[in-house]
Amino acid sequence: MKNYLLQIEYFGKNYCGWQRQSHSPSVQEELEKALSKIANQNIEVTCAGRTDTGVHATSQIVNFYSNADRPLSAWQRGVNALLPQDIKILAVQQVDNNFNSRFTAINRTYNYIIYNSATSSPIFAEHCLWENRELDIDKMNQACEYLLGEQDFSSFRSSQCQSNTPFRNIQKAEFIKQGSFIVFEVVGNAFLHHMIRNLVGSLLKVGLGFESPEWIKVVLEAKDRTQAAETAKAHGLYFVGVEYPEFSFKRQIIKLFC
């Protein structure tokens, strides 16, 4: 039995998220269906980060086991031929049998993209959140400092979150402006359900001047979801990278835009 790693890109608009669901199409379902056909046996995959409905990925990492004798090209080109246009395998390699894309991961990186312009863009409408009001990046980054380290993020977790603990360790949280785009990059060991989108929603209130940077600290300490702002829309969020002890994978979405 061999263990294979896949690097996946997908556009999440047409899916209920990564995880297989009985009521709607999912990225996992499409990938397992294509892999199973190439392997001529049932294939089940594990991913580094289970993205929500409408969320995208430029570098999702997946692993699966198979005893099917296939060249690496079959696992990439062959499977890609069976996948829909909004899901594709970028790379494939054989890895140690102990490797697990989820549990071996040290940290995960997400980008949230904001198109900050007076006029909306028909081209980018489905790829980023449009905000026509000017955002104060400096104040947003001041607020981000309160997010760093291991903390209780109860104020930013969904009511449907099934995690056993609200504690997460954030190593980086930063807004970067590139032309009309503002990129929120966040790196952490893991994230709660809707956590990043809830953070973005609250940080936008700071950037628009409705709240001070210190307000984020107050919300964190409240440990109460009702104290934070509304959840930012899903279509601006991208899973862009994973770090493992032996290697890392990262494809920043803004570099694909610019």
Swiss-Prot record:
The keyword Isomerase applies. The active site is at D52 (nucleophile). InterPro entries: PsdUridine_synth_cat_dom_sf, PsdUridine_synth_TruA, PsdUridine_synth_TruA_a/b_dom, PsdUridine_synth_TruA_C, TruA/RsuA/RluB/E/F_N. Its EC number is 5.4.99.12. Gene3D superfamilies: Pseudouridine synthase I, catalytic domain, C-terminal subdomain (3.30.70.660), Pseudouridine synthase I, catalytic domain, N-terminal subdomain (3.30.70.580). One of its GO terms (molecular function) is tRNA pseudouridine(38-40) synthase activity. It catalyses: uridine(38/39/40) in tRNA = pseudouridine(38/39/40) in tRNA. GO terms for biological process: tRNA pseudouridine synthesis. Coiled coil: none annotated. It is an enzyme of class 5 (isomerase). Keywords: Isomerase, tRNA processing. Substrate binds at Y110. Belongs to the tRNA pseudouridine synthase TruA family. Homodimer. HAMAP family: TruA. Formation of pseudouridine at positions 38, 39 and 40 in the anticodon stem and loop of transfer RNAs. This is tRNA pseudouridine synthase A. It comes from Francisella tularensis subsp. tularensis (strain SCHU S4 / Schu 4). The gene is truA.
